[in-house]
Amino acid sequence: MIKRIAISLKKEYWHQIIDGLKPVEYRKYAPTDDPEEPFLAIVHVSGTYAWQGVILFYGAEKDPETGGYCWIIRQVFTFPEGRRPMAYYHKKNGQPITGWPQTFVELSR
């Protein structure tokens, strides 16, 4: 089964990604150290209470400036307005839980 993570992004950054304008450097979020292993990231946008979409990452390029990897976006799935699954929040600090909604488990098969 493909590895999955949940990430939180700023609204402007998410829109740059879905418009194809932004490469993504996610060494700290990647659930693997192998740049050839694909993974899915479900995206929560700061200031909202819903998941916005899913990004499929596959492959990585070495970033000469940071020495880390710049993970390559292969496909972006966005959830239609009004049909987004709600995010789950920790009661203590209001941060999104890095879980994975069961509805989207089939995307990883």
Which ranges hold each PLM region?
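Structured alpha/beta reader/binder surfaces that contact nucleic acids or chromatin modification marks
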Residues: 1-109
